[in-house]
UniProtKB/Swiss-Prot annotation:
Keyword Secreted in record: yes
Described function: This peptide both inhibits the activity of the angiotensin-converting enzyme (ACE) and enhances the action of bradykinin by inhibiting the peptidases that inactivate it. It acts as an indirect hypotensive agent.
This protein's name: Bradykinin-potentiating peptide 11c
Subcellular location: Secreted
Organism field: Crotalus viridis viridis
GO cellular component, as recorded: extracellular region
Length: 11
């Protein structure tokens, strides 16, 4: 699960 406010941001 991504952090809140993040939308599929590559590492």
């Amino acid at each position: 699960q991504s952090a809140p406010g993040n939308e599929a941001i590559p590492p």
